[in-house]
Design a protein with these regions (language model features):
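ATP-binding N-lobe of GHMP and related small-molecule kinases
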Residues: 1-97
């Protein structure tokens, strides 16, 4: 099992101007901070006895046989990019709603 914890970030202005795709061609100015609230991602291999291969939990719960059936676009494309074939559960939780 892998558990990741990341502090939640608050951007006051500047939005996405701290991404290389933007600041390589434009100026970027950002004022942001983090707070003492966190976002968590838990990942684990699924045991083989489930009827599905992928369980994704965020504000919805998805249980699918194939990666292509996953509706969450970021999760689906990450698993495709990583060529992930083994059953996995990915759960997102946060200290804030």
């Amino acid at each position: 099992m892998i558990i990741c914890r990341t502090p939640l970030r608050i951007s006051f202005f500047g939005g996405g101007t701290d991404y290389p795709a933007w600041y390589n061609n434009n100026d970027g100015r950002v004022v942001s901070t983090t707070i003492n609230k966190y976002s968590y991602i838990n990942c684990r291999y699924l045991p083989p006895f489930f009827e599905y291969n992928y369980r994704i939990r965020y504000y919805k719960r998805e249980e699918t046989k194939t990666v292509d059936q996953i509706k969450h676009p970021s999760v689906r494309e990450c698993l495709k990019f990583l060529k992930f074939k083994k059953g996995i559960e990915i759960v997102h939780n946060a200290d804030l709603p």
